[in-house]
């Protein structure tokens, strides 16, 4: 799949962004080529991803509200590449053992 985003704002510049095989292949002005899809993005800002510094994943202890898997999948669907989970868990995330548990669970989700 190839995609060309035309006339978007990247930083302070208006330019095109070419994406091939889910990776940014080129950024520049007036990119030419045969693309599967072309999006006219006049006046829109292109960002690669977002970071959520205030995420309530609730695992361990409150998985019935949200867990690492469901919260991570929702974050990816919303364009977030990184989330930082709040310590409102049971037990509270206040030591390395709980942090290790969360990191291990995140690896299991494998996004």
Model feature map: region roles:
Residues 73-111:
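Divalent-metal coordination cores built from histidine and acidic residues
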Residues 2-4, 9-48:
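Histidine-rich, glycine-flanked metal-binding segment
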Residues 12, 54, 87:
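Residues that line or immediately flank small-molecule/substrate-binding pockets and catalytic motifs
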Residues 25, 67-73:
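Short catalytic helix/loop segments, enriched in acidic residues and glycine
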């Amino acid at each position: 799949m190839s995609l060309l985003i035309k006339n978007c704002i990247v930083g302070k510049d208006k330019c095109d962004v070419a994406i091939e095989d889910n990776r940014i292949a080129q950024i520049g002005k007036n990119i030419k080529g045969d693309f599967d899809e072309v999006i006219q993005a006049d006046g829109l800002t292109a960002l690669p991803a977002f970071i959520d510094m205030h995420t309530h994943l609730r695992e361990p202890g409150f998985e019935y509200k949200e867990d690492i898997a469901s919260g991570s999948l929702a974050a990816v669907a919303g364009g977030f590449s990184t989330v930082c989970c709040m310590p409102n868990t049971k037990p509270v995330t206040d030591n390395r053992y709980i942090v290790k548990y969360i990191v291990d669970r995140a690896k299991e989700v494998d996004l």
